[in-house]
A protein has these predicted regions:
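Loop-helix junctions at membrane interfaces
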Residues: 1-226
Length: 226
């Protein structure tokens, strides 16, 4: 079996388990952020941007099916934030920064968004961070803000909320995305290290090429890639 397909299956199973663990409530919604928000984007590094996004899609879709929720257009389009976060995390090119100006423009084109224009300025932070993607912490920050920017635009056009609520969320975003940045950074480092150790066993040694050698705990990592 192709190593990436096998790893995709493993990742999907782990993702479904992570999806069952809630970590915070999504303001303005009846849903919660789950542990998968921290694990989901890392699939882009191990599987590549496309397969990482597909794996994130399957995790979300299977979770909806298992919970017998309606799999309608709005539900599917809300898969995009995590999928694009995986794409961002998996791509090395700085061109991924384009997602943030696009989201800012889409946010400001909305009448409610224009009244809460300062909310969209938050995305200038990950835009700048995109030019330092070699660093895992900056790549993690960009990935979680990719999910945030895309998710916010979808939420704005789907549910609205008042300008006052959007503005009041600004300090919450900094705390929330700071936590998610550290969470993605930690998840990636731990997952990569465990995979590196497990692939020392002959039975799964063929998965070794999926290990990111730059993201293993070492002096070199903290000096150049952390």
């Amino acid at each position: 079996m192709n190593r990436k397909i096998l790893f995709s299956i493993i990742f999907t199973i782990l993702g479904l388990a992570a999806f069952q663990i809630s970590i915070s409530h999504i303001i303005g919604s009846s849903q919660n952020f789950t542990l998968f928000e921290l694990l989901g984007p890392t699939g882009g590094m191990f599987l590549g941007p496309i397969l990482g996004a597909i794996s994130a899609f399957f995790v979300k879709a299977l979770n909806v099916i298992i919970l017998r929720q309606p799999l309608d257009f709005l539900t599917i389009i809300r898969f995009l934030p995590t999928m694009l976060a995986a794409v961002y995390f998996g791509l090395k090119q700085k061109k991924t920064a384009i997602i943030f100006p696009i989201c800012i423009i889409l946010f400001l084109l909305n009448p409610i968004g224009r009244q809460a224009w300062m909310y969209s300025l938050i995305w200038l932070i990950p835009f700048v961070a995109s030019f330092g993607k070699k660093r895992l912490i900056l790549n993690s920050l960009g990935a979680t803000f990719t999910a945030h920017a895309v998710g916010s635009v979808i939420f704005l056009y789907s549910f609205g909320l008042t300008p006052a609520i959007w503005i009041s969320l600004i300090p919450v975003v900094f705390i929330e995305r700071g936590f998610f940045t550290i969470g993605i950074w930690t998840s990636c480092l731990v997952f990569n290290t465990i995979l590196d150790r497990l692939t020392d066993f002959k039975a799964i040694h063929f998965l070794k090429p999926l290990v990111n050698q730059n993201c293993l705990v070492s002096t070199k990592f903290f000096k150049s890639f952390a």
